[in-house]
Structure formats: structure tokens, C-alpha cells
Amino acid sequence: MADVSRSSSLYTEEDPLQAYSGLSLFPRTLKSLSNPLPPSYQSEDLQQTHTLLQSMPFEIQSEHQEQAKAILEDVDVDVQLNPIPNKRERRPGLDRKRKSFSLHLTTSQPPPVAPSFDPSKYPRSEDFFAAYDKFELANREWQKQTGSSVIDIQENPPSRRPRRPGIPGRKRRPFKESFTDSYFTDVINLEASEKEIPIASEQSLESATAAHVTTVDREVDDSTVDTDKDLNNVLKDLLACSREELEGDGAIKLLEERLQIKSFNIEKFSIPEFQDVRKMNLKASGSNPPNRKSLSDIQNILKGTNRVAVRKNSHSPSPQTIKHFSSPNPPVDQFSFPDIHNLLPGDQQPSEVNVQPIAKDIPNTSPTNVGTVDVASPFNDSVVKRSGEDDSHIHSGIHRSHLSRDGNPDICVMDSISNRSSAMLQKNVDMRTKGKEVDVPMSESGANRNTGDRENDAEINEETDNLERLAECASKEVTRPFTVEEDSIPYQQGASSKSPNRAPEQYNTMGGSLEHAEHNQGLHEEENVNTGSASGLQVENAPEVHKYSHKQTNKRRKRGSSDSNVKKRSKTVHGETGGDKQMKTLPHESRAKKQTKGKSNEREEKKPKKTLTHEGKLFSCRKSLAAAGTKIEGGVRRSTRIKSRPLEYWRGERFLYGRIHESLTTVIGIKYASPGEGKRDSRASKVKSFVSDEYKKLVDFAALH
């Protein structure tokens, strides 16, 4: 403790700045340390600080003192401050005046002399060309500085490019016009000489056309001038005329006189009468439009599609159909038919046509004239056999409804029923055998064998005779078969099932393709069946037909796609002797319809699937653009593109090109350098082939170069 107190006492004695505060330690105040120190103080009052500063000596320059006085006195005095020593000053002008800028050339000083070149100083060619290059550079620079290269262009134009020297010994002839004024004088002299010496027709034609060139031009010019004058005169005359003179035909007569127009009489004109163009009587809407022969081109294009309209020319419709056709209000449901119970005796349904009077008028009803069968009824086509108490009296009627494109029902005679020449029609004969429905294809002979009753045979023969007559009429016109959609059928099916005298109808049509026709002809040669009947019947003869059905079904499986079309588009002809039997077979036939429709739908669904799979195979076989330049190796797709490092062409590395197929040249190999075994610097060139060994010679030949 004694040591600490001793050191502190020493510190207080030896420290000379202990009595000064921080403000008194500036460098200026340190100069005054030689003066005696003021008494020490410990307080920090502001007043003591001021007194301390005032007592201390202050050295100040005279300039600073004057500035301080001026600021304090607030006197406007220009204080001369010393300039900044590092400030850049302008160079003195050496007591010369600055020249004013002017665009005029100074004539006081002579222009600089252009550089010259003396070739005699350079005997050596190397020195000569080096000096000449320097001279050109100096001359260009001098021209840029003086501007003589721009000003003297007009005075000294650049020399023209010399032409290529021609072949020695040849002199170019000056150009001369081949067609001159003397040509016309020669032509006139030739015309005069033609009278004495005849020339060829072609030469005379050319000379005549050349001679009349100028005259025709003059005539055209004269005519245009004359027409302009005439038009101006006509306009002046029209403006000079009064209103009374121009009323009526006055202006027209004036124009006819001045322009020399021939007047014509309208009464003398007669318009020719065209046979194919006829007037339309819009008031007579209740009557049928008159028969009109269509144009030959349209008739060829629409052959077979408008056969109903063509058939109207040969058969006049019944009065019932006329009323139905001319009705301004068509029925709401175009496919519905009135019930047969609501008809009065003697009335006839609009879709029913009696065939017997028509069949009597048809000539030449021989069975050999029957053509190919194409049943083209779009909605309903059936033959209904009605029998009463007297079996001898058979009334057969044909029911058919046809709807035209514009929505009006058009009723006409049934197109065709049977085919006698093919002698075979595939019918859907619904049989009830042991509680099962069987679809049996039957020929006319098979139908006649299976019908046990002779009365039924007589009825069938009598009915088929009537059908043959209708088939002969239908065979005269070329028709096109078409398939009826099943969605448009149920309205008629429901209406026909209500009436007891109508058998249920199946809405299937026969296909008229060439394959089906050839198939029918082959069947006709195999089975020489009885030609006395021409329709298939639905017969309830279970045991006999069941045996026959197995044979026919086996044949049908072998026939392929032709019979499938027949089965889809087959037509059923129902013949029964009593109304009770018809009512009994109604549920059985409805089940058969569902079965046949289901089969046809299955076949129609299978066909587009086959076509789709075939198109899919073709599409899958096509090369994919995404897989271009790749191949599959070991289940992994790898690139077939040629990959190489940057080739060193200065060492002889390069790609080898060649034509290995009928296209452009392709890369067939690569030639690269590889380090040798012994020396490091030496590299041997190697060849790598990208093609098969078949083109090895081609690769080696390309690697030699």
C-alpha cells in the first residue's frame, strides 16, 4: 500500500498536463506551454473555459484578422482571395489576337504541296514497290486533309474500266438497225411488182400486213377523232332541244338518227317455247303436278334413287292417295297408321294398295322375265294373306308406306317381291319346334314340300302368281338396295300388332350386292328347284322343318359374309289361314324378332371392330418420328447417331463419306489418329467403319484420300 501511494504521488508531481482540459491540448495551445501555467482547476464550468481561452495567447495572421473584421463589421468589401495553386490556367497568347472563324480559304499562306514520287530514285523493284505504297498512303491522307479528293472529281473523273481485249484478227462491226424507213419503200415497190411476178401466199400476206400498218393506225386515229366530234355534237343538240321536243320518243328518235341506230319493233319478236320448261299453277295445289321428263344428266346421276317418282308415270295413284298427298297439314306422327277396327266397310288404309287390278294390266307375265330382287321398302313391306269362311275366296293385299325426303308420305305400289331367275331367296321362317325359335332358310321347293295340305298349296300357288306379275313390273327398273334402320320401325310394328287381320311384320330388306347375286345364281345351279312358286312362307311344321334346318344352317356357316348380309336384309312373307292362328303366333314371332335383331346387331358391331383393328395395325406399323435415329438393343432403346470427339483435321482425322444406297452420300466411317506403341509423339491413323463388311472396299478407298 505504501508503494501505491508513493507512485500516485510521483504521478501527480511529474504530469505537466494535469491542470489542462481537453480544449487546451490543441497544437496552438501547446506552444504556450513555455508560459507559466495557470492555476489548476477542477470544475468544468463554461465560464471558466472562456476565461481560460481569453487568457491564452493567440497567434493569427493579418489576412485572417482583416477577414474576420470585415465579417464582424458586415462591410461589403471585395476580399481578394488567393487562387487555388493547382487550378489549370489558359496558356498565354503570346500577345497575338485570336483569329475569327471563316469558311473561306486563306490566300495569305500558300497551299501545301502534294507529295510526289520519283521512280528513278529506286532502281530495285523491292524498294520501288515499298516507296510507292508509302506514296499512295501519303497521297490519300493529303487528299483527306485538303479535301481535294472530293472537289476535283468533276475536273478529274475516274478513268473508265478497260474492256476485255477481243480475239486478235476480228473487228467488231458497228450496230445497224435492221428495220428502217427504207423498208416501207421496198414493200411498196414489191406490191407493184406482184402484179407482174406472182409470189407465194405467205410472203404476200406478210408484205400486205406490213404495208397497211401505218394506214390502219391513221384510220383508227381518224375514226376516234370523228366519234368524239359526233358525240359532242349529239350532246349539244340534246341540250339545245326543249322539253316538248324530248317528251315521249323524241329523244330516242334523235339518238337513232344521229347515231344511225336501226329501230326495232317489239311486237315482231317471238320467244321460243321450251319443252322442258313449263309453267307452275300454284292455285291447283290439290292436284298432282304434271309429268315432267327430267334432263338426261340428272337422270343418270339419280338413277335408282328416285324410282318412286319415275313409277308414278306408269301408274296413276288412287283417289285416297291424292287426298293424302295434297293435304296441307301432314299427320303429326308420320309413322302411325289408323287401326283397322276404326275403318268403315269399303274404306281403305292409306298405305294399302290393291294389287289385283294392277297385276291384270301387266303384260308378259312369263316367269323368265323376272329380274333380280331388290326389296327397297324403307319402312313396311309385307304380304298379308287373309282368308274368311270361304277358302276359295282369297284376298291378298300389299301394305307399304314410303316417306319422301321432304316429309310427305308418298304411297306407291310395292317395288318387287321375288326373284324367279335366281330361284332362291333366304327368308326368315320362324318355326316353333319344341319350344325353340329356329331361323330356317327355305327355298320355294322346300316350302312346297313342307306344306302338307293341298289347300295351302293351292293358296300359295295362287298368291305367288300374283307376286310374279308384280316382280316382272319391278324388274324393269334399276333399283338400289338399302338397309332400313331399326330405330324407325317400332311405330309400325306396334300398329300392325294391334289389328287381328295383320300378321306381325319383320322389317328386314334384301341386299342387292353383286356377291349376293352371284351366290344366288350358284345356288340355282346346285338346286334345280320348282319354279312354280316365288316366295318363302312361315310354316308351323315342326318335325320336318327341324331336320331340314340343320342341313341349311351347316351350309350357311360355310357361305361366309354373303349369307350374313342376306340374313340381315332378309324379308319374311307370312301366310296363315285363320285369324286365331295369327293371334297364337304373336308372342312367338316377337321373340324371334328380338333374336334376329340381336344377331344382326352383333354382326354390325363386329365389322367396324375388324376395320378398326386393321387400321390400327397399319398405324402401328408406321415408323415413329419420335423413335428416329434409335434402335432397341436388349430391351433398351439406344441411339444410332454417330458420336465422336472433335477431330484433329491437321493430323488427318476426318469422317469418311460414301454412297451406299440410292440417296445422298452418308457417313460410312471415321479416320482417326491413335498414339503408337513405341513412341509417344508418333500417331498411327486408324479407320473405323459404320457400315457392314459388304462395303469394306468402299470404306478403304475413302480412307486413302
UniProtKB/Swiss-Prot annotation:
First and last residue of the signal peptide: none
Where does the record say this protein resides? Chromosome, Centromere; Chromosome, Centromere, Kinetochore; Nucleus
Name the InterPro entries on file.
CENP-C/Mif2/cnp3
Q: Which domain of life is it from?
A: Eukaryota
Q: Where along the sequence does the record place the motif called Nuclear localization signal 2?
A: 159-166
Q: Name one GO biological process term.
A: kinetochore assembly
| Nuclear localization signal 4 (motif): residue ranges | 592-599
Amino acid composition bias (Basic residues), ranges on this chain: 160-174, 548-559
The molecular function GO annotations come to: centromeric DNA binding
Q: Where is the composition biased (Polar residues)?
A: 315-327, 490-511, 529-538
State the span of motif (Nuclear localization signal 1): 86-93
What residue spans carry the region label MIF2 homology domain II?
Answer: 636-658
Spell out the Basic and acidic residues composition-biased ranges. Answer: 429-439, 466-479, 515-527, 573-592, 599-615
One term under GO cellular component:
kinetochore
Q: Where is this region: Disordered?
A: 146-175, 311-351, 386-408, 423-615
Q: Which UniProt keywords apply?
A: Cell cycle, Cell division, Centromere, Chromosome, Kinetochore, Mitosis, Nucleus
Q: Which family does it belong to?
A: Belongs to the CENP-C/MIF2 family.
Q: Domain text from the record? A: The MIF2 homology domain II targets centromeres and binds the alpha satellite DNA in vivo.
Role played? Component of the CENPA-NAC (nucleosome-associated) complex, a complex that plays a central role in assembly of kinetochore proteins, mitotic progression and chromosome segregation.
Quaternary structure?
Answer: Oligomer. Component of the CENPA-NAC complex.
Know the name of this protein? Centromere protein C
Query: Organism, per UniProt?
Result: Arabidopsis thaliana (Mouse-ear cress)
Q: Which gene encodes it?
A: CENPC
